[in-house]
C-alpha cells in the first residue's frame, strides 16, 4: 500500500501508438505534397556537351543552309567570365560588325537571346556594357561566333526563323584553334543537342533568380572547381549537388532536393 505523500511513479512509454489510420494520413499528405512539388518543377533537358574555346580569339563559322530573314539566335553557356561576339554574312567572306553577346559570370546555365547592347556607366562610374531584352533579328546565311577569352564554354546555339522554327545549321569551320590544348573541343558540340530547348527561355529550362549562384555552386564541386558562392553555409549546396549528380545539370536536377527537403 502506497504511503500518503509518496511520489507517484509512471511507467515510461515511448511508443507513438500510431494506428493504420495515422500511417495512411501521413503517407497521403506526403504523396499530395510530392505531386504538387515535383510536377512542373523544371525541365529534364539541358545541353550538356560544350564547345570550349582553346584561344582568346577562336572562331566558329556556321552555315544556315540558305539565306534567312529575321533570324534570332539563342545560346546556352556554362560558367564564363567575359562576353563573346557574333557576326553575320551572306557569302562567308564579308562580315557585319560584331554583335556582343552577354555572357557575364552570372549568366550561366540559362537560355539567352542575342540582344542589342550599348556602353554606359554603372552606379560607381565604371564603364559597363548594358543589354536590351529584345532579340536581334538579322538576315544572313552564315554566322561567325568569336570567343573573347580562353575557356568560353558554350553548350548549344539555336537559330530560329521569323516563325520561330529552328533552322538546320552546320559548323563549316573552326578557326584560330590550339589543338594541343587540353581545352580543345569540337565546335560541332554547339549544334548537337537542338532538342533540349522546350518552349521559350524561362524558369522552366534555365536558372533564374538566386539559382545563378546556388545551382552553379552545387555543380562546381562535382567537377573539382572552387565554389563560386560562399556567403551562405555550404550544406544546402551540397544537398543540391546530390540532385545534380543523379539527374544531371538540368533544372529538375538542381531543384529536386530543395523540393523534397521542403
Please tell me what each predicted stretch does:
Residues 111-126:
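Surface-exposed intrinsically disordered loops and tails
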Residues 22-36, 187-191:
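Alpha-helical transmembrane segments
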Residues 1-20, 52:
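Membrane-interfacial, low-structure loops and terminal tails that flank and connect transmembrane helices
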Residues 28-35, 239, 257-260:
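Lipid-exposed faces of alpha-helical membrane segments in multi-pass integral membrane proteins
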Residues 68, 179-238, 242:
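Extracytosolic helix-loop segments that constitute the early lumenal/periplasmic catalytic or substrate-binding loops
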Amino acid at each position: 500500500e502506497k504511503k500518503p505523500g509518496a511520489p507517484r511513479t509512471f511507467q515510461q512509454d515511448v511508443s507513438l501508438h500510431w494506428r493504420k489510420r495515422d500511417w495512411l494520413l501521413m503517407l497521403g499528405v506526403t504523396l499530395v505534397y510530392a505531386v504538387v512539388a515535383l510536377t512542373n518543377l523544371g525541365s529534364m533537358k539541358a545541353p550538356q556537351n560544350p564547345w570550349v574555346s582553346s584561344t582568346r580569339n577562336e572562331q566558329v563559322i556556321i552555315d544556315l543552309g540558305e539565306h534567312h530573314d529575321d533570324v534570332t539566335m539563342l545560346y546556352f553557356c556554362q560558367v564564363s567570365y567575359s562576353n563573346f561576339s557574333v557576326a553575320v554574312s551572306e557569302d562567308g567572306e564579308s562580315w557585319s560588325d560584331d554583335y556582343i553577346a552577354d555572357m557575364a559570370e552570372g549568366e550561366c546555365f540559362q537560355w539567352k537571346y542575342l540582344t542589342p547592347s550599348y556602353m554606359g556607366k554603372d552606379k560607381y562610374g565604371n564603364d559597363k556594357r548594358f543589354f536590351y531584352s529584345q532579340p536581334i533579328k538579322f538576315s544572313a546565311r552564315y554566322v561567325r561566333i568569336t570567343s573573347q577569352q580562353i575557356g568560353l564554354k558554350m553548350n548549344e546555339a539555336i537559330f530560329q526563323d521569323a516563325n520561330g522554327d529552328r533552322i538546320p545549321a552546320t559548323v563549316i569551320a573552326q578557326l584560330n584553334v590550339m589543338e594541343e590544348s587540353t581545352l580543345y573541343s569540337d565546335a560541332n558540340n554547339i549544334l548537337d543537342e537542338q532538342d533540349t530547348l522546350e518552349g521559350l527561355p524561362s524558369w522552366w529550362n534555365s536558372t533564374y533568380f538566386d539559382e545563378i549562384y546556388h545551382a552553379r555552386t552545387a555543380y562546381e564541386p562535382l567537377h573539382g572547381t572552387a565554389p563560386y558562392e560562399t556567403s551562405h553555409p555550404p550544406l544546402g549546396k551540397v544537398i543540391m549537388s546530390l540532385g545534380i549528380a543523379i539527374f544531371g545539370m538540368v533544372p529538375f536536377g538542381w531543384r529536386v532536393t530543395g523540393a523534397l527537403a521542403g
